[in-house]
From Swiss-Prot:
The gene is MT-ND4L. It is a multi-pass membrane protein. Belongs to the complex I subunit 4L family. It comes from Macaca ochreata. This is NADH-ubiquinone oxidoreductase chain 4L. Core subunit of the mitochondrial membrane respiratory chain NADH dehydrogenase (Complex I) which catalyzes electron transfer from NADH through the respiratory chain, using ubiquinone as an electron acceptor. Part of the enzyme membrane arm which is embedded in the lipid bilayer and involved in proton translocation.
Length: 98
């Protein structure tokens, strides 16, 4: 396996481990999720460049759109929780239900 791909997979794995370790804080979880999305974006971009297929050229852009939507929703939840409770614990998400 090419060392570039191994480094990107290592970045994804480290972000996944960070997500599992810091799952009680929303800010740390969002940062780890962004790291995972960026490593997936780089991986799909490299695959699209190597295959040179017109069908795979749109995949990194679609992934980037979903990452931006995920970041916007995550930051909205973070602002809502921090304004309401002053903390960024994920267990406060259950308290936001009507």
């Amino acid at each position: 396996m090419i060392p570039t791909y191994m480094n990107i997979m290592l970045a994804f794995t480290i972000s996944l481990l960070g997500m599992l370790i810091y799952r009680s804080h929303l800010m740390a979880s969002l940062l780890c999720l962004e790291g995972m999305m960026m490593s997936l974006f780089i991986m799909t971009t490299l695959i699209a460049l190597n295959t040179r297929s017109p069908l795979t050229n749109i995949m990194p852009i679609i992934l980037l759109v979903f990452a931006a939507c995920e970041a916007a929703v995550g930051l909205a939840l973070l602002v809502s929780i921090s304004n309401t409770y002053g903390l960024d614990y994920i267990h406060n998400l259950n308290l936001l239900q009507c």
